[in-house]
Amino acid sequence: MNLDICKFNLFITGIGNVGFKLFEELSKNRNFYIKNHQIDFVIRGISDSDKMYFNTNGISFENWQHLMKNGEDSDEELFFKKVKNFNLQNSVFVDNTASKKVADTYIHYLKNHIHVVTCNKIACSSDYFYY
């Protein structure tokens, strides 16, 4: 049985230790996810506190660090606008930071039907009413 592959379009902020490990895991296990689960993860945007980089065709697991060096200055609001303008089905904003400022942007993603995945301790321990 040949099933279509479901693509998840990832927009990742925070590419320090946790973000680097995420890239490593996605790169190492990509073929497994495609073959066994018919899921592909395509990274379309990345950012850290200094730079951000987007590519409509996807960002290579092999040279993302080099691409980041040539990215534009990082800005949370502009990052969100670019993610929104991509207008892709199955878009996922991934927050690997410990930033309240980034966590405060989740509402914009969610209101625009963009999934949010986070390990942000500040966001996960904020006021329950907010969530």
Name the predicted role of every residue range.
Residues 6-27:
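Glycine-rich adenosine-cofactor-binding loop
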Residues 31-72:
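NAD(P)-binding Rossmann-fold cofactor-contacting core
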Residues 99-112, 121-131:
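Rossmann-fold NAD(P)-binding glycine/threonine-rich loop
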Residues 1-8, 30-32, 82-83:
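A short, basic/flexible loop-to-alpha-helix module at the beginning of a structural domain
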Residues 65-102:
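A structured beta-alpha segment of the ubiquitous adenosine-cofactor-binding alpha/beta core
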Residues 9-13, 42-49, 93-94:
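Extended hydrophobic secondary-structure segments that form protein cores and membrane-embedded regions
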